[in-house]
Amino acid sequence: MTAPVIMVLGTASSVGKSVLVTALCRLARQRGLRVAPFKAQNMSNNAAVTADGREIARSVAVQAAAAQIEPTVEMNPILIKPEGQRRSQIVVEGRPWRTLDALDFWRRKEMLWEIVTRNLDALRARCDLVIAEGAGSPVELNLKAGDIVNMRVARYVGARCVLVGDIDTGGIFAQLLGTLMLLEPEERELVQGLLVNRFRGDPALFEDGVRILEQRSGLPVLGVIPWFEDLHLPEEDAVALERGNRLARDGLTIAVIHLPAIANFDDFDPLAREPGVTLRYITHPDDLSDAVAVILPGTKHTLAARRWLRERGFDVALHQFPGSIVGICGGYQLLGERISDPLGVEGQGGDEPGLGLLPVETIFSAAKLTVQADAVSRAPWAVGARLHGYEIHMGRTRSIDADRPLITVTQRGADAVEEHDGHISKDGRVWGCYLHGIFANDAFRRGWLQHLGWHPGEELNPSTDPFDHLAQHVAAAIGEKQVRWLFDIG
């Protein structure tokens, strides 16, 4: 039997589609359905690594976790990773395919559509329900001829579509009614209901708004979802950072340098969730003044990021910075003595001196390592802590001085190994490694924070599963009757 598809469409980018798909995946799973997320094409430098070493969008991997299944490439067959200068690396079925500009990508849409349908068919064959996510708006009329992620997917599977608007940004009537108006008649017939997301205050105050939307659209408003203050799920892309430091709070301050083509910045979400910790994304050295630590995150363009740091004045500022300095993946490469790209892996290639804060050198190769990994910490604040995360990089880094590894990798994919990774300075102040997800380990994260002078205070009660918390929030707004109607389970 082929699984039916529910599709969450949005009136624009960042209206909450990804989070709502996450919630629906958990709600479906709670009701006994074998459910899987799907997004035909995603644009983000936040990638996750599947068990077989493939890349998919981090947001889709989070949705799979909500569905309580392993993420696979069928859930996100095309991933677009922007590299700057209007070019992007295209990841197809979890493997880097080629780097294209927008026009080249557009010309290959029909070939990519075959990949989309093949993977969606495979996913539907092994599930009870697929919950698909659109991208941006389904009525970008100048782009619609090349659509492989919104209404073309909906038409292909006859999806039951839900259209979501963000009332917090204003213009909810124009968002929802305008989008419906611009859909083709056969597309509009697929839309089964509307959702109003991110309402601040008492939803009862929007009862007139619900009536107006239903009268003018002829569709039910399935729910008015209140603003969710305690959403502890990764943001999808750097748009979230451009909205400001929404995770910041009073207390110990950690600065994250917002590098060009920043990638996998959800590495630092566990830090921001700790009480008494402020996480601040910065672009200027002056913003380091009250920080006790600074983190250099991953980036799709390490050499370009190196030049950017020099131009912004970070070289001098980081050498004078008295606190802890950390690099993850590309950030680790930046902390070293030299970065070389003889094959032009990152574009034009070249050779740059690093920041000179760790005695390591990096050389890029054509082979990309994407793998889940287990490791053991050698850091003085968390000796022996068992870590789990993933590696995703094309550079290879070696120590050129006394070898002081930060971690020992014990498993890469299915292979047992014993390999050192990363480096830590003699005084423990500067360190870096390739392992994404290192801060998700409680012992490592809290040990490092206490090393910086953090005092956790009274131990908080263990929080509920964030997916259950989110699902409960959405179900309360929609109602059980509507949830079961949406899933067609009576």
Curated annotation (Swiss-Prot):
Annotated GO biological process: cobalamin biosynthetic process
Pathway annotation from the record: Cofactor biosynthesis; adenosylcobalamin biosynthesis
GO terms assigned for molecular function: ABC-type vitamin B12 transporter activity; catalytic activity
Gene3D superfamilies: 3.40.50.880, P-loop containing nucleotide triphosphate hydrolases
Keyword annotations of the record: Cobalamin biosynthesis, Glutamine amidotransferase
Coiled coil regions in record: none
Domain GATase cobBQ-type stretches: 251-444
Family annotation (InterPro entries): Class_I_gatase-like, CobQ/CobB/MinD/ParA_Nub-bd_dom, CobQ_GATase1, CobQ_N, CobQ_synth, GATase_3, P-loop_NTPase
Active site as annotated: 329 (nucleophile), 436
Chloroplast keyword on record: no
Sequence intervals crossing the membrane: none
Function summary: Catalyzes amidations at positions B, D, E, and G on adenosylcobyrinic A,C-diamide. NH(2) groups are provided by glutamine, and one molecule of ATP is hydrogenolyzed for each amidation.
Entries under PANTHER family matching the protein: COBYRIC ACID SYNTHASE, DETHIOBIOTIN SYNTHETASE
Annotated family: Belongs to the CobB/CobQ family. CobQ subfamily.
Protein name: Cobyric acid synthase
Organism: Roseiflexus castenholzii (strain DSM 13941 / HLO8)
Organism ancestry: Bacteria, Bacillati, Chloroflexota, Chloroflexia, Chloroflexales
